[in-house]
Every structure is written in structure tokens, then in C-alpha cells.
Amino acid sequence: MGKVMLEVNNLKTKYVTRFHEDVYAVDGVSLKIEEGKSLGVAGESGCGKSTLALSLMGYYFAPLHYISGDIIVDGRKISGMKPDDVRKNILGNEIAYIPQAAMNALNPTQKIIRFVEDVIHAHDPKMPKKDIYDLAKERFQILGLPAEVLQKHAVELSGGMKQRTVIAISTILSPKVLIADEPSSALDVTSQKMVIKMMRDLMEKDLSNP
């Protein structure tokens, strides 16, 4: 058995609202994922796949609430942590998330390099802009994106380029665990295959260069 990178034990989360009955969105989920391995979660629309993805990051905001269970990333328990602590210490470098409809996750009025700076500065506020640019340039090129993309706005990019840009930003700190919520759902079949292959190649590169 290889090193366990993500372990979840009897995780329970639920949606709590004033006007509706509480709903357990994740009810007793347990799983283990070893280093270098992947796990797919399948189910019909509305069954809770996206909620599970959000829950696994240990990052909760109303109406979604953590109830009980353990989430352990590379031996570090993150369940029950305060949202600010998760954002500063966990998201990005320990565990990263590529959202569903990722193409809509980019503010159209902001340059791409600013998104990269925000992610990195959350963990290393003193990193010089030149170092951030060099790191971003290398990561973007791995995903087939020219360095010029960093100076563009989201509205200037095609759908496929936006998707790859979100992947590049999400993985800029080489996270130990990557959670992808249907990252290729808005793309055509050819682009879907390309994005999935790039994600796999990216994670394999990070594993070989820890």
C-alpha cells in the first residue's frame, strides 16, 4: 500500500436554512486515496457530487455546514478548521479545487496574472512579482498556454484557454491533492480529452518533482 494522501472517515455535512428542513448532503462518506492515484465519483445530477467536492476541502460557508468526521490530507487533519485557516494554510498548496463551470470562475475585469498573485500571496505574501511571473509562465506553458495569456483578461480567452487557465492557477503551488468537479463539462469531446490528459501530465510532473 502506498502513502495515503487523502483520507476521509465518516464525513457528514448538511445544508441548514431557515425556511427548509435540514438536508444531509454528505452522510457518512469514507475513502482513501494513495499518492499518484485518482478516484472518480459518479452519480446523477443533484446527488451531491459537487457538495462532496467542496466538503473534502474542509472549506465551509453557510448554508453548508460541517457536522462530523475526519478529513486528513497527507497526515494533517483539516476537518473542523476555521475557514480563514483553511484558506491560508491548506487551499492551494495542500489541496486544490477546480470548480464546475470553471470558465465562469474568472473575473472578466482582472488580468490573469492577478489571480495567480492572489493564490500565491495567500501563502507567501513576500514572494516578488518577478518570481511569481516566472513560476506562472512555466506552469502555463506546461498546459500549452503562452506567457502572453498572463497579461490578458478572461474575456479575451477562448473557452478552452479559460479552462486551462483555471487549471494552471489552481495548481500553481503544486498541491498534494487535486479535486476537480467536472472540469471539462463545458468543452467539446476533443477538448475534454486534451484537458484531462494535461491534468494527468501536470500531476505526474509534480509527483516527480516534489
Language model: regions and residue ranges:
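Catalytic Walker B motif of ABC-type/P-loop ATPase nucleotide-binding domains
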Residues: L178-D181
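Conserved ABC ATPase "signature" region
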Residues: K130-E148, R200
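A short, proline-enriched helix->beta-strand linker immediately N-terminal to the Walker B motif
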Residues: I172-K176
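ABC ATPase NBD coupling module
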Residues: I78-A96, A122
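Conserved ABC ATPase signature
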Residues: H153-L157, M161
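Conserved ABC transporter NBD signature motif
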Residues: Y66-K77
